């Protein structure tokens, strides 16, 4: 041998930071992570949620990104052409607040942070393709936000209407959410109670896609996300019923229980309902107006709180129950929300808990119309919301309530006062923001032509550099005459631009498409590249985005399909939600709490690979938990010891039996493969640690060729987790650059067959011991082995064994009483 790999290693020594800096330079110089476009390989578009450029990457960013990077590397080594881009979600309120605090422009603060974070992302050792980077505050990006707005507008999916905002009657201005303070919702500037006021706002008509958004058949997403979206969309089947209010006209309600109509003994409208002012009698006017003002100061969350006392006032008006012709009083009450249903309800106190509480308080009749089981006809002590026989319901008496819903709806339809209906809790997406640092909405207002969209050829409508962005509660662009005053693109006359900017969730609803061609000028993305890469194969990100970003991006994709931009229905085929790494105090990391953990001190002390591996080792990725650096030294020791496998002396020249080394190596490859497929990074690293110990124990007992082959496989499966260490050790081994361009090792099923397995033994679901058992052991023998353990016997002696739960080859649970 010309030179052993141990001698090559000894010349360099072990310096993780020097190793990492050297290989990061080499990777950049050789373009190692430039996206492979080889069409003969299967595609894998891996995407992690783009970060907000807040200044520095904290440990939470590392926790989100390094496992995603590890899996993308794994897929690349398995023979996929992998697209793994990164960008920055750069518009938004934090930039304005930081700029105000520091007295600088939001643009300067944002781009300075982006530059710093780029370097930190490279230091992390990721395989991001930075050539695909997008920055959402760049005009070449937000131009296409505006283009999408125009397309939505053409399709009737973007519209303007009055929507409630927080308003300070003393300052005579709207307030941003953060300017409303305290439990009683007061203006932070003047301490005046804040009210709700309707102002013209722009919305996207996501409700047009509500039904389709309930279809998850084409995607593999966590059940919890799907459940959250189903609940957010809130589909309900029932009936719309028209009640006549005396002296006013018809008001429609939606109910899921038309079978209870005969029990409606009062009627309730939300404080914001447009009928309130008209139906209120003069003698009730002052009380009703005061109540409406109080309700306007409350949040919808508070109003919907089921534990809160139900309040309301009589309007003086009466409605007519269409089922029996009875006059019933009309109340205004804040437990009815304008945003759900029609903003009016038929109140059936016997069969609705909120209505029951309200009726008790106001002395309103509570009439049972669905008989509970064994009901004796006496008044109900609490609302009965279950099924039963219809009673006190005229021609429907004796009808089962489930059947009665359909029959009553049909009866109402025949009479022209009702119809079957589907209702959704989902509201249209309000995209107007009265802030500066966002995408200008491409609309102008002309006295002659009305609302006029900006022509596509005039995009982008640029955000002015010299705007005053100090918060006033109104759109900062409103005070910039140079921006606001313009010509009507239709008639050439004087006009004014829309001065609201777009919700930043618009930016992140389609960014995965722009990554494909960040500088493409003919459309939002290059369709040719789109045909090669879309849709996203694997998305990773937090579950906190379930009902906003993850819903909005699905909506956007469906609209893009209907615009002919894509030929599929869903943006991301598979989704994995990682947990949240919390601050040392157990709270989510944030600069305002002062609990952000800066990873730089750990990188400086141990290197990036150690921090990467530690974050993946501390527990299941989908669980997260508080940051605790207590175990990081152990991970550092492991990688240092792993390095000695190629640096700590030569191996034997003897030809030893390679059987056990080969078997263990093949088992390692299979285990790590399966763990990575299932996002079980912690167990994969545990397997690598265990195998490292074994290799150190047998080093010197096998021949060089067998050792080299075992080391090749070990380094290949180590590479996605500790890319710098694996690259360094691969070179020391004498292999060609780069380990990350090698194929993933395979395994022989004959060699991975276990002769023995370790059974976890539980008693009543609690871990009591582990026992060795022959592979393929049956339940009876497994029970015998479990009961042979002294630890297990201590928990079962003198107790009756009632049941055995056996997971073959893995676990046995003895259920005793």
Swiss-Prot record:
Its EC number is 6.1.1.4. GO terms for cellular component: cytosol. The keyword Cytoplasm applies. It catalyses: tRNA(Leu) + L-leucine + ATP = L-leucyl-tRNA(Leu) + AMP + diphosphate. It is found in: Cytoplasm. It comes from the Bacteria. One of its GO terms (biological process) is leucyl-tRNA aminoacylation. Pfam families: Anticodon_1 (PF08264), tRNA-synt_1 (PF00133), tRNA-synt_1_2 (PF13603). Belongs to the class-I aminoacyl-tRNA synthetase family. HAMAP family: Leu_tRNA_synth_B (MF_00049_B). This is Leucine--tRNA ligase. It comes from Rubrobacter xylanophilus (strain DSM 9941 / JCM 11954 / NBRC 16129 / PRD-1). The gene is leuS.
């Amino acid at each position: 041998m010309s030179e052993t790999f141990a001698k090559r290693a000894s010349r360099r020594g072990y310096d993780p930071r020097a190793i990492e800096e050297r290989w990061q330079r080499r990777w950049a110089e050789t373009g190692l992570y430039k996206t492979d476009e080889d069409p003969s390989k299967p595609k894998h578009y891996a995407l992690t949620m783009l970060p907000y450029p807040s200044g520095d990457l904290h440990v939470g960013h590392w926790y989100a990104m390094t496992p995603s990077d590890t899996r993308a590397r794994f897929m690349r080594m398995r023979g996929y052409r992998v697209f793994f881009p990164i960008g920055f979600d750069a518009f938004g309120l934090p930039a304005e607040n930081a700029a105000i605090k520091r007295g600088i422009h939001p643009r300067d603060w944002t781009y300075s942070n982006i530059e710093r974070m780029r370097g930190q992302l490279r230091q992390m050792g990721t395989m991001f393709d930075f050539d695909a980077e997008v920055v959402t505050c760049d005009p070449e990006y937000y131009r296409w936000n505006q283009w999408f707005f125009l397309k939505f507008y053409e399709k009737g999916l973007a519209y303007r209407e009055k929507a409630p905002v927080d308003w300070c009657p003393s300052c005579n201005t709207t307030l941003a959410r953060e300017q409303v303070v305290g439990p009683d919702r007061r203006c932070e500037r003047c301490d005046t109670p804040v009210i709700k006021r309707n102002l013209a706002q722009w919305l996207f008509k996501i409700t047009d896609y509500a039904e389709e958004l309930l279809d998850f058949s084409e995607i593999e997403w966590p059940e919890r996300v799907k459940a959250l979206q189903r609940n957010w969309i809130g589909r309900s089947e029932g009936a719309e019923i028209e009640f006549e209010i005396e002296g006013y006209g018809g008001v429609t309600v939606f109910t899921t229980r038309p079978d209870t109509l005969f029990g409606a003994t009062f009627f309730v409208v939300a404080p914001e309902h447009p009928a309130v002012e008209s139906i209120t009698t003069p003698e009730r006017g002052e009380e009703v107006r005061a109540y409406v003002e109080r309700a306007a100061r409350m949040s919808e969350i508070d109003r919907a709180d089921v534990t809160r006392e139900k309040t309301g006032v009589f309007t003086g008006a009466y409605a007519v129950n269409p089922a029996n012709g009875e006059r019933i009083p009309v109340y205004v009450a804040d437990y009815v929300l304008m945003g759900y249903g029609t903003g009016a309800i038929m109140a059936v106190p016997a069969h609705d808990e909120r209505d029951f509480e309200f009726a008790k308080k106001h002395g309103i009749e509570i009439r049972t119309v669905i008989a509970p089981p064994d009901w004796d006809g006496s008044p109900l002590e609490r609302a009965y919301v279950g099924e039963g026989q219809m009673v006190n319901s005229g021609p429907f008496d004796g009808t089962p309530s489930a059947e009665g819903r359909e029959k009553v709806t049909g009866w109402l339809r025949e009479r022209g006062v009702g119809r079957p209906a589907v209702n959704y809790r989902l509201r249209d997406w309000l995209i107007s923001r009265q802030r500066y640092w966002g995408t200008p909405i491409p609309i102008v207002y002309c006295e002659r032509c009305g609302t006029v969209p900006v022509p596509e050829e005039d995009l982008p409508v640029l955000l002015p550099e010299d705007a005053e962005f100090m918060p006033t509660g109104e759109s900062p662009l409103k005070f910039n005459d140079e921006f606001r005053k313009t010509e009507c693109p239709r008639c050439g006359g004087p006009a004014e631009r829309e001065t609201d900017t777009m919700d930043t969730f618009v930016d992140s609803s389609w960014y995965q498409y722009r990554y494909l061609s960040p500088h493409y000028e003919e459309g939002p993305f290059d369709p040719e590249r789109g045909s090669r890469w879309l849709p996203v194969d694997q998305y990773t990100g937090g579950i906190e985005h379930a009902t906003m970003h993850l819903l909005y991006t699905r909506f956007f994709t469906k609209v893009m399909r209907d615009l002919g931009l894509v030929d599929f229905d869903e943006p991301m085929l598979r989704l994995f939600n990682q947990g949240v790494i919390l601050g040392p105090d157990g709270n989510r990391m944030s600069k305002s709490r002062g609990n952000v953990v800066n990873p730089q001190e750990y990188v400086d002390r141990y290197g990036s690979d150690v921090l990467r591996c530690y974050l993946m080792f501390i527990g299941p990725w989908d669980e997260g938990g508080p940051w605790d650096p207590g175990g990081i030294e152990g991970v550092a020791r492991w990688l240092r010891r792993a390095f000695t496998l190629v640096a700590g002396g030569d191996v034997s020249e003897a030809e030893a039996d390679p059987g056990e080394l080969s078997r263990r190596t093949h088992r390692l490859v299979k285990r790590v493969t399966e763990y990575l497929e299932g996002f079980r990074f912690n167990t994969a690293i545990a397997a690598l640690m265990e195998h490292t110990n074994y290799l150190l124990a047998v080093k010197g007992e096998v021949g060089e060729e067998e050792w080299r082959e075992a080391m090749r496989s070990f380094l290949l499966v180590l590479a996605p987790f500790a890319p710098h260490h694996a690259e360094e050790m691969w070179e020391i081994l004498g292999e060609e650059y780069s380990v990350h361009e090698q194929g993933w090792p395979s395994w022989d099923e004959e060699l991975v067959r276990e002769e023995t397995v370790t059974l976890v033994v539980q008693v009543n679901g609690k871990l009591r011991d582990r026992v060795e058992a022959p592979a393929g052991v049956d339940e009876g023998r497994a029970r015998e082995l479990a009961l042979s353990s002294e630890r297990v016997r201590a928990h079962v002696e003198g107790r009756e064994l009632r049941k055995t739960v056996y997971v073959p080859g893995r676990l046995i649970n003895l259920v005793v009483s």
